[in-house]
């Protein structure tokens, strides 16, 4: 019911504002790792290509095992060692759509190395460290104080390295956090404006 309401809300906004793309949601596995819950979410959300967000190797393996819809996204966050990146990269050869989200600069080198060693190309995203933040519960752990995400200079360097490695066309996602329990719409507007620059 919630997935349906969420999808309908985005669909309505897409039509209202004549947005020229689609909404594709993902469920964070860390919120509930129970197999029966994840299977129901995937089953009900399959009509909209609803996917999963994972934050560890074990969650990645869960996502790869459960997601059969080749159009569903598998967003790969969290600490990414060599094995995590290799698994996500090889999953592309199996017709899956994992997007490895670069959250730390050292992950760029590991991704490029995996591409060279495995002769496979992952989809890539970048987590930006925005200056915009909220006063909500997690407001102090985001923005310039965040331990995750790349600053603007780091993003520019990452883009340069991805171009040099012929991976820039695999860049599919810009990811950022502005906190939770946001009570002022201006915070969201500021973050979107900053992210779009």
Which residue stretches match the model-derived regions?
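Low-complexity, highly charged intrinsically disordered N-terminal segments
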Residues: 1-23, 28
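Active-site-proximal beta-alpha core segment in soluble small-molecule metabolic enzymes
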Residues: 23-196
């Amino acid at each position: 019911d919630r997935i349906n309401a969420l999808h309908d809300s985005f669909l309505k906004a897409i039509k209202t504002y004549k947005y020229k793309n689609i909404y594709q949601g993902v469920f964070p596995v860390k919120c509930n790792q129970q197999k029966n819950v994840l299977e129901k979410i995937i089953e009900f959300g399959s009509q909209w290509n609803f996917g999963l967000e994972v934050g560890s190797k074990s969650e990645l393996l869960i996502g790869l095992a459960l997601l059969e819809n080749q159009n569903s996204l598998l967003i790969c966050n969290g600490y990414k060692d060599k094995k995590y990146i290799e698994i996500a990269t090889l999953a592309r050869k199996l017709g899956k759509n994992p997007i490895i989200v670069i959250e730390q600069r050292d992950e760029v080198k590991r991704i490029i190395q995996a591409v060279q060693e495995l002769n496979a190309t992952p989809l890539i995203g970048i987590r930006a460290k925005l200056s915009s933040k909220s006063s909500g519960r997690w407001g102090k752990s985001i923005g310039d104080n965040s331990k995750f995400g790349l600053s603007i200079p780091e993003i520019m360097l990452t883009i340069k390295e991805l171009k040099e490695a012929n991976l820039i066309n695999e860049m599919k996602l810009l990811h950022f956090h502005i906190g939770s329990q946001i009570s002022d719409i201006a915070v969201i507007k500021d973050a979107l404006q900053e992210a779009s620059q």
